[in-house]
Design a protein with these regions (language model features):
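Compositionally biased terminal segments of proteins
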Residues: 1-159
Length: 159
């Protein structure tokens, strides 16, 4: 599990390694990692959830991460004791349902070497967390995260 400082360290290490190897990647990140980086929650996260990368039409689905990135993620995971899947595209299928309109205009971009991490605005994270919280109990981390976002009735209806 990674606290905010450890998460920043891992991303900085990954960005520096990509830069050293002459590679770059831009990732749209959701989930607990994005909430932690934005300071919405204090709970640690197990991983970074990548759903997409910038494209000419907004964000494309990141269902398969490029080999150079997978290798760098593995190397950083080994070096920092995070395991090989600490940065993954597990929830990329959310893109198939459609991203919130205007999301690309509202992201916050954090740069770590040649790695850009795109963090959705809180209103967009409400959409993702509402989706994740469906069919789960009030004790789930997704439900707790949704409560931390404190969405308005309008945001919930839009989500």
């Amino acid at each position: 599990m990674m606290e905010r400082e450890r998460l920043d360290e891992a991303l900085a290490t990954l960005g520096a390694l990509l830069q050293e190897r002459g590679e770059h990647f831009n990732a749209l990140v959701i989930g607990g990692g994005s909430l932690l980086l934005l300071g919405v929650v204090e709970r640690p996260t197990a991983d970074i959830d990548v759903v997409g990368y910038p494209s000419a039409t907004g964000y494309a689905k990141a269902d398969v991460l490029p080999d150079f990135l997978v290798a760098a993620v593995r190397d950083v995971g080994d070096a920092l004791g995070l395991g090989p899947a600490w940065f993954n595209s597990g929830p990329a299928g959310l893109v198939d349902f459609g991203l919130p309109p205007g999301l690309a205009d509202r992201v916050t971009v954090r740069t770590y070497g040649t790695l850009e991490v795109h963090l959705p605005a809180l209103e967009d994270l409400v959409c993702f967390k509402l989706y994740a919280a469906v069919d789960l109990t009030e004790r789930s981390k997704h439900f707790t995260d949704l409560q931390a976002l404190a969405p308005s009735a309008e945001q919930l209806l839009q989500a």
